[in-house]
Amino acid sequence: MSAKGLGLKNKKQWLGLAHAAARAWLDAPTLELLGNGHIHQTFLLSDQEKPADRYVLQCVNSAVYGDIDLLMRQTRMVLDRLQTASAFAAEYQLPELISTRLGESVFVQASDGEMRSWRLWRFIKGSKTCDPPENRQQIRQAAQAFGAYQRALAGMEIEQLHETIPGFLSMSGYLRQFDQVLATATLAECEQAAPWIALAQSHRQWPSALMQPNGIIHGDCKINNVLFDQQGERVLSVIDLDNNMKGHWAWDFGDLVRSVAFSRGGFDVDDYRACLQGFLTGRGSTPLINEHLIYAPSYLAFMLGLRFLTDHLGGDVYFSVPEHGDNLQRAMEQFALFQSFERNKALMGRIVSECS
């Protein structure tokens, strides 16, 4: 979550704010913090009068998503599209937004001189995340779900969805931000991060085709954005629709490979093969460019490392961290993944040739 967008409050304060907001939906809510996302504050919400009913309550980060009306409008549009994609809707449960008792998509809360927007999702019963994945079958199933998600949205016109985060996943934009922050960073900060600044400066050139949007993407294909059943045997749902927008199809694939490698301690050739097989199955017969399947993991790992590094040098204004220096550590981890992907490009190329 962003320090600016949500405010730096302790757990007790956040629980108080969330409890007050939850009354826009329920008379007798109980709740607890849920997950450790970087962007939103999220809570598991129950109804004391109907304890079997559970929900996910989120405070949307307005510093990251400046136009919350646009965000919610597009979320509804995507959900409507997924509902009409019969094959996808038959295989996976769709996330369900719950309107307030006044029929609003969000509840706007005024507190401490700040305005906060809250939304409520129905909790998908019997679901859990598998992060890290326990086996390659889970990796393959997650990849297939994300591929099928792209396929379900393929009929939408690319211009129907606007950027919910201006410049999101734009390498050229992130490089400009990096340059701007680097120009004003302190000497001490630059010296501390010198090896990673040098790495960022030496890898500024990428295939131009990989940087051009060519379809609708999920935009946040982390392994924890699919929900499995309690046995971890089947994907129940694809969640987190905030970043659905136009993009390059390979960004979703690359981000999943990056996410799996990060959660399992590094690049593994069989994990990559499972991602590739699942994603290709989910996408169906749509022709894909092999080179992009090879470059995409490096592209996404480098991009995320660059974003963490930029935020560290700029004072941690986007990604919330307990201590200054944590974003630099995150950058180092992503850059290490990037270097691992670069070392294994030839191997990935052989696997792509085998599976295509």
Summary of predicted features, one role per range:
Residues 2-29:
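Juxta-kinase regulatory segment immediately upstream of eukaryotic protein kinase catalytic domains
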Residues 32-36, 58-59, 66-69, 128-140, ...:
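ATP-dependent phospho-/nucleotidyl transfer catalytic cores
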Residues 38-41, 46-48, 52-55, 60-176, ...:
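Conserved ATP-binding subdomain of kinase catalytic cores across diverse folds
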Residues 240:
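Conserved active-site aspartate in kinases
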